[in-house]
Amino acid sequence: MGRRSTLYNYNGIPVNLREGYASFIEATKQAHPDKSLVMNAVSRYGARQIGETGKVDFFYNEVWADEADFTNLKAILYENGVYGNYQLNTVFAAYMNYNKADNRGEFNTPGILLTDAVMFALGGSHLELGGDHMLCKEYFPNENLTMSEELKTAMVHYYDFLTSYQNLLRDGGTENSVSMNCTNGEMRLNSWPPQQGSVTTYAKQVGGKQVIHLLNFSQANSLSWRDVDGTMPEAALITKAALQMNLSAKVNKLWVASPDAHGGALQELAFTQENGVVSFTLPSLKYWTMIVVE
């Protein structure tokens, strides 16, 4: 339900709804121990109480205008990690092109793909498909916006990618920082958080692999995941960017994969390593490319 004003029980005594979440979940699990449970932390409301029960299967966060920035998504994932003892993944209920959906039209593909790219790269997932259509409002039967054939195809690639590389995307790991630069001027790079006019990197160490996500904000007209009016511009395709990154450990293999290219299939790349600097050429970046160093 999210945040409400002061609430009262039948006898007129104030009730802290959020503090009641835990006992509600505990009682439900006790009554139905064989059932899987999930509870919606609307705008983060009650997320700590929900997660600390240890009785839900994943976090479910319905996010709204008060959490409209891409940085808010990462903050939610961090908090949920703490609340769930780093054992639970997060699903965002996040309605795209919300204002545009007041009238009939078509989803804005660039906005959808950039948001999914960020959510997936950060380790989250996105509840955005309901029945036979994409969700644009909290009233799920709303079908004012339709998906183009391009978007339908892209959704298959993005969810195939999320599934194929789930161990790298959603199976823990330690966030770190990898210094990276482009030596032929094909892209401007910055480390998380995102900047307009730039390609943002987000890095994690996952087991014996160093993972670096490239997220393309080069053409972005805002840093809001919601793309409420459906105006996010299409990202320009970047090809053959000469990249260097500082890695002290010996590199045995370097590969990339993207839901925007080759159906998400990995491509092993040639590279050189000298004095802790790894040099290679990135085949392409549209919205999201994942670099994996072994």
Language-model segments: residues:
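Active-site neighborhood of glycoside hydrolase catalytic domains
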Residues: 1-58, 64-75
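Aromatic/acidic polysaccharide-binding cleft in carbohydrate-active enzymes
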Residues: 4, 84-177, 206, 218
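Acidic-and-aromatic substrate-binding clefts and catalytic sites of carbohydrate-active enzymes
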Residues: 42-49, 63-76, 99-109, 136-137, ...
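Acidic (Asp/Glu)-rich catalytic clusters
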Residues: 50-53, 77-86, 119
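Conserved, mostly hydrophobic/aromatic
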Residues: 57, 119, 212
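Carbohydrate-binding surface patches
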Residues: 187-249, 289
